[in-house]
Regions:
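Catalytic alpha/beta core domains of metabolic enzymes, predominantly
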Residues: 82-181
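Short catalytic helix/loop segments, enriched in acidic residues and glycine
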Residues: 2-14
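Alpha-helix-loop-beta-strand connector modules within alpha/beta enzyme cores
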Residues: 34-60, 106-113, 164-176
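Glycine-rich, proline-tolerant flexible connector loops at the mouths of alpha/beta enzymes
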Residues: 22-45, 92, 149-154
Length: 181
């Protein structure tokens, strides 16, 4: 099942590391398996991964599933290597993943303050332009890293033609950016 406890997360991450993984995207959970924003849980997972998976890139989730906006960036002071940053809102099947502009600006500022590389999550084309605007305003550093999130219900379908278009637009607005999908 889903690794829930700190020790389970560290153990499963170590297995992935041994198999060749170089990056761990971390969501922490409460004992009842609901999403958590508890900075101490993030710190414990981070410490365990650093100890057992030397050199692995640690990326914290700032995602909003069931988490209060005020708490979503509350763990960034632990200075992970990377953290997710959705640059706009999207309709998920079970609700709205809310990322209003002032909230995105605040998370971006915190990542800049702690020298955290954002993984810019792009669920639609507007979010790509929002990310470019964050760089123009000095809230993100170039070169950016973009994650095109595709194949999720109510977001972009996972189609080659769409990805090729997104890459073309990325090169136009952030020519030095790296990307994954």
């Amino acid at each position: 099942g889903l690794p829930v406890t700190t020790s389970e997360q560290i153990e499963e991450t170590h297995k992935a590391f041994e198999a060749g993984a170089t990056l761990a995207h971390i969501h922490v959970r409460n004992v009842d398996e609901t999403p958590s924003s508890d900075p101490s849980l993030y710190a414990a997972v981070q410490e365990g991964i650093q100890k057992h998976c030397p050199g692995m890139i640690i990326q914290f989730s700032t995602g909003g599933r069931g988490r209060d906006q005020a708490a979503r960036g509350g763990m960034l002071f632990h200075r992970p290597d990377m953290a997710s940053l959705a640059t706009g809102s999207v309709n998920f099947p079970n609700g709205i993943y809310e990322n209003p502009p002032e909230f995105v600006d605040g998370l971006a500022s915190e990542m800049l303050k702690y020298d955290i590389k954002p993984e810019i999550e792009i669920f639609d084309l507007a979010m790509l332009y929002n990310a470019a605007n964050l760089i123009e305003r000095g809230l993100l550093k170039a070169p950016a890293h973009v994650q095109f999130v595709m194949g999720i219900p109510n977001a972009m379908p996972a189609r080659r033609s769409i990805l090729e278009f997104l890459i073309s637009e990325l090169k136009a607005v952030m020519p030095d950016a790296t990307w994954t999908a």
